[in-house]
């Protein structure tokens, strides 16, 4: 009887551990489209725009952030890191603002390959987001809702007017039931 109770307790504990991570966090099934280092290096060659998000407030970009974009420089192959230059606006300042962050590819959810980004801001804040899906010109990023962040999803692409269908479909699949808003639009360039 004790063995049965211990077995049930172990099964329950393991299911709760799995329950703390999203369904897409499965390296065997989805790892080919969750390569954080490949995604970071792509930021050096292209500007990426956050075209959609399911949350409004960020500890760095502010409340009701809009017009978020990023480009990278200073690639460090040994650390698997870049210096990222973010541009954004928010409800406190309608002028374009900038933030420089060191972004490092790290592992989350027991993955063997780096599948997440650790951001280190100039003032010492540290945040970690996870790649839910990535392809050549787009990323769907999961913000776990820790470290002062709201939980949600972001859709990033190199062409804000032509969002690749595969990424838009993944974003919509993962963001189902959440309010989605546009972040970077052509209005950001006016």
Curated annotation (Swiss-Prot):
Signal sequence span is: 1-19
**A molecular function (GO) term:** amine binding
Which SUPFAM superfamilies would you find in this protein's record?
Lipocalins
Q: Which GO terms describe its cellular component?
A: extracellular region
* Expression across tissues: Expressed in salivary glands.
Positions that bind histamine 1: 39, 55, 58, 61, 101, 127, 139, 154
Single GO BP term: symbiont-mediated perturbation of host defenses
What is its biological role?
Answer: Salivary tick protein that acts by scavenging histamine at the wound site, outcompeting histamine receptors for histamine, thereby overcoming host inflammatory responses. Binds histamine with a high-affinity (Kd=1.7 nM). Contains two binding histamine sites (H and L), that appear to bind histamine with differing affinities (high and low).
**Subunit structure of this entry?**
Monomer.
Of which family is this protein a member? Answer: Belongs to the calycin superfamily. Histamine-binding salivary protein family.
- This chain belongs to the protein called Female-specific histamine-binding protein 2
What organism does the UniProt record list as the source? Rhipicephalus appendiculatus (Brown ear tick)
């Amino acid at each position: 009887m004790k063995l049965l109770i211990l077995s049930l307790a172990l099964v329950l504990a393991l299911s709760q551990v799995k329950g703390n991570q999203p369904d897409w966090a499965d390296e065997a099934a989805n790892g080919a489209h969750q390569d954080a280092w490949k995604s970071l290096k792509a930021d050096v060659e292209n500007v990426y725009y956050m075209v959609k998000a399911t949350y409004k407030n960020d500890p760095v970009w502010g409340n009701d952030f809009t017009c978020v974009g990023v480009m990278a420089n200073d690639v460090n192959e040994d650390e698997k890191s870049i210096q990222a230059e973010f541009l954004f606006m928010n409800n406190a300042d309608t002028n374009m603002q900038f933030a420089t962050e060191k972004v490092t590819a790290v592992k989350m959810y027991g993955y063997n390959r780096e599948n997440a980004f650790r951001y280190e801001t100039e003032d010492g804040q540290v945040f970690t987001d996870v790649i839910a899906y990535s392809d050549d010109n787009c990323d769907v990023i999961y913000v776990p809702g820790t470290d002062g962040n709201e939980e949600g999803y972001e859709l990033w692409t190199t062409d804000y007017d032509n969002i690749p269908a595969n990424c838009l479909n993944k974003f919509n699949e993962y963001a189902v039931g959440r309010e989605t808003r546009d972040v970077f639009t052509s209005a950001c360039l006016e």
